[in-house]
């Protein structure tokens, strides 16, 4: 039986420009939570907002004692760490039951996190906003030498991707000092159990090393 974490119906409002060919100049602006509300957009989405209010999406799931965001650290962040840890806690009992093995590493992508967790009540709506893509969670068997490629990728990326089980130690110039898997030195010839998503397995975010997996297990979980 498939288990679904969260999914959301994304509403897109398309505004049409006039069909003339006048040259226009556009300035790029970063869109984030600090951008003020737009009254026209708010008017367009108000009917859908009311539908959400009347639905069970406002059901309270938990309470957060602090704000979690993916941008409060350079190589680590509170929200990325939370995502990776939560994925391990959910998936490891499932995989252990069917294989009698444990998950070694979790690697997701920072770009898959689309919102923040504010301090206070957490509703179903919050969960849907965080993960709108409903990616399939997979477990891959990777040899140690592929894990080395993973480490090199992460060093080059310098992003706070959600990671569990992999500890990477860099110097101030981002040169690798050492790394380990759950406190143990990597064995290049050993196989490791790595959890990721179908999007990343297909090369999303240029994580092409996942294609070198020895075996793929579908955990029947959607994020």
Description of each model-found segment:
Residues 21-32, 82-84, 88-223:
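Feature captures C-terminal
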Residues 1-4:
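Positively charged n-region of N-terminal signal peptides that target proteins for export
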Residues 27-49:
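Post-signal peptide N-terminal segment of mature Sec-exported envelope proteins
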């Amino acid at each position: 039986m498939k288990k679904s974490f969260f999914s959301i119906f994304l509403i897109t409002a398309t505004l049409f420009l006039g069909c003339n060919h006048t040259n226009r100049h556009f300035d790029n602006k970063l869109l984030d939570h600090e951008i003020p509300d737009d009254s026209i957009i708010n008017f367009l989405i108000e009917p859908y907002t009311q539908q959400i209010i009347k639905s069970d999406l406002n059901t309270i799931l938990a309470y957060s004692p602090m704000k979690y965001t993916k941008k409060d650290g350079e190589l680590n962040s509170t929200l990325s760490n939370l995502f990776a840890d939560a994925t391990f806690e959910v998936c490891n009992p499932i995989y252990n039951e069917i294989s009698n093995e444990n998950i070694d590493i979790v690697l997701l992508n920072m770009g898959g996190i689309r919102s923040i967790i504010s301090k206070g009540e957490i509703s179903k709506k919050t969960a849907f906003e965080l993960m709108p893509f409903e990616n399939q969670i997979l477990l891959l068997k990777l040899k140690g030498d592929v894990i080395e490629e993973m480490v090199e990728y992460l060093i080059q990326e310098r992003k706070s991707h959600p990671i569990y089980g992999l500890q990477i130690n860099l110097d101030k110039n981002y040169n690798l000092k050492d790394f380990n898997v759950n406190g143990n030195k990597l064995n290049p010839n050993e196989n490791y159990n790595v959890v990721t998503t179908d999007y990343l397995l297909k090369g999303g975010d240029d994580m092409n090393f996942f294609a070198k997996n020895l075996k793929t297990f579908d955990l029947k979980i959607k994020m």
